[in-house]
């Protein structure tokens, strides 16, 4: 994400997680617009990141393909649970042994460090369980157009 407003945003680079879901919350706060409190808002307010280059409040990100959880990002780690090439026509592959990468040291995701990081895997497993417990399945507006 690249944002520029020298009157409001401190110039610099933050190498943390930020998603498009954070834009609604952040821009609402910047415009002094109240965030709805009658529903769960997935995005985080990134104003402190923009103003002081502090760490992002977003530590986790869930990669979905439709309703399928494909991968999970936790801090600098990314765990792939399933693989699916978007246009090759092959079925989705559920990995017997997931792929774990440290994106700080391996941004190209070439070296699977799954076997050497059981503590990270335990933490990501906790994150997945909490996420699935908190998840509210919404109607798929692209499929359920009836």
Language-model region placement:
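Short, small-residue-biased leader/transition segments that mark boundaries at the very start
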Residues: 1-3
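C-terminal cap/loop subdomain of S1 sulfatases and analogous C-terminal strand-loop tails that border
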Residues: 7-16, 20-99, 103, 138
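Active-site oxyanion-binding pockets that recognize sulfate/phosphate
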Residues: 10-13, 110, 114
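Non-transmembrane alpha-helical segments in soluble domains
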Residues: 24-28, 47, 51, 111-114, ...
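Basic/polar N-terminal segments that are highly enriched at the extreme N-terminus
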Residues: 51, 143-146
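Bilobed periplasmic-binding protein-like "clamshell/Venus-flytrap" ligand-binding domains
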Residues: 56-59, 130-144
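Residue-level structural signal for beta-strand termini and adjacent loop
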Residues: 84-85, 113-115
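Intrinsically disordered, low-complexity polar regions and short flexible loop motifs
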Residues: 106
């Amino acid at each position: 994400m690249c944002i520029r407003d020298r009157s409001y945003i401190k110039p610099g680079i933050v190498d943390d997680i930020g998603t498009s879901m954070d834009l609604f919350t952040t821009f609402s706060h910047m415009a002094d617009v109240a965030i709805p409190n009658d529903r769960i808002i997935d995005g985080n307010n990134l104003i402190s990141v923009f103003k002081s280059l502090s760490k992002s409040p977003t530590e986790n990100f869930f990669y979905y393909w439709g309703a399928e959880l494909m991968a999970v990002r936790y801090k600098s780690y990314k765990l792939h649970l399933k693989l699916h090439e978007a246009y090759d026509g092959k079925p989705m592959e559920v990995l017997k042994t997931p792929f774990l990468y440290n994106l700080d040291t391996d941004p190209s995701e070439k070296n699977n460090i799954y076997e050497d990081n059981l503590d990270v895997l335990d933490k990501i497993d906790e994150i997945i369980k909490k996420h699935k417990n908190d998840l509210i399945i919404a109607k798929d507006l692209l499929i359920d157009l009836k």
